Amino acid sequence: MGRIVVAPLPKIAELAVRHGCREMVSLVAPRQDFHRPAVISAGRHLILGVNDIAFAGTGKLVAPGEEHVAAILAFARGWDRQAPLLVHCQMGVSRSPAAALLIALAVEPDQDDHALALRLRQASVQATPNARLVEIGDRVLDRGGRLVAAVRTIGRGADYVGDSPFVFSAAPERGGP
């Protein structure tokens, strides 16, 4: 099936249960405390301590790095896609949508980057994928700048108006983009 549930931190328990998620990627501030939903397997929970910033060198903040992208991609490649994968950050707007794009490309590498970005925008008007995660992912996945260009094409999402989780398919629909 290959569905990715993208959520803000306050909604993870509710959405994990509602969608039957058993695995989760958490992109949260370093040392941020939160409880893993009981339905999520401890062995299939990736926690990355990374701030939502687009460049390094901002004091004590941790910028997304190649090691974070490598961990996301390795985790994605271990996802059996039998149940939806829950991906979250604090607000569900920047880090987690960027990770969802990278996960989709890790499990379905032959898909079109532009069509993928359009699917993301159709799923969420608020999503504004973290530029640094996208840029590093583009390079590591050898996309040749196509993912970066596709995300630039969809532009910044709508202003944040509250928690707006969404479900995003890792693969294009048959006969669609």
Residue ranges and their predicted role:
Residues M1-I40:
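Glycine-rich, flexible N-terminal cofactor/catalytic loop recognition
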Residues H68-I72, L85, R95, A99-A100, ...:
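Amphipathic alpha-helical interface surfaces
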Residues V28-A29, V50, M91:
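Glycine-rich His-Gly loop
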